[in-house]
């Protein structure tokens, strides 16, 4: 039996409303994941330069090795045949959906997807929701390390993500961490402020996931760290991120390493905690 025209109109309206509700119901974490996959596809189809220019925000940062505008940096690089593939494995979104971060693993092949030379990486991306509802990366940073024992492809999002009531600022409550680093040492400071599900990311090492693993690494190295005053800080709901410079000094006070650090802070059980902590050294001049 043929449908009448009014019935077709009603069905079309119902279908449109259903599709709209499904889009609206999409979780922010899922949207970040989908954005990551679209980003990776753009890199594969258009090249690394164009892909990053498209998905970095206008003021997005990269470390090259100093902090600089990511879009401008990629515009000034010559075209590259390199292949870059990745898997987001951890996504957390602020309570108001305005800010998010993702962590994942990646493989870089300088001469393209058939290149037998492979570099293994982990990255940290910070995402900011744009006026049109889409997300752009305001920071993209990564570390290199030997080939890991496994390369996960599934992603997770903390079950408590986005459920915290914000009563105080990360900017104020992070200060005691930096003070404690100076007065009581790195291990005690991180033991006090690291989240149980934190990622500690250090160049040359596969990331340490979880407070216990991170503290074990810090206790074995016991670095004397000096943090510079923050250069970049952004807070939205129960999530915040900060970036600046750090230096590591030996017992005589001589600087042995200098670089950029990024920290993601999240509010859990009324306390701001470090969710991700990345150090990326700046090579000494001449290297």
Feature names for model-found ranges:
Residues 1-31:
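Bacterial Sec-dependent N-terminal signal peptides
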Residues 24-49, 53-54, 136-138, 145-187, ...:
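Short, low-complexity N-terminal intrinsically disordered segments enriched in polar/charged residues
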Residues 29-33, 47-98, 187-238, 255:
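A solvent-exposed, acidic/Ser-Thr-rich amphipathic alpha-helical stretch
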Residues 39, 99-103, 124-127, 135-136, ...:
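Short, structured motif recognition centered on aromatic/hydrophobic residues
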Residues 58-59, 103-109, 243-249:
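Generic short beta-strand segments
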Residues 74-75, 88-93, 106-108, 122-129, ...:
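Hydrophobic/aromatic beta-strand elements that line small-molecule binding cavities or substrate pockets
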Residues 118-155, 260-283:
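Short beta-strand edge/turn micro-motifs at domain boundaries
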Residues 224, 232, 238-287:
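Hydrophilic extracytoplasmic domains
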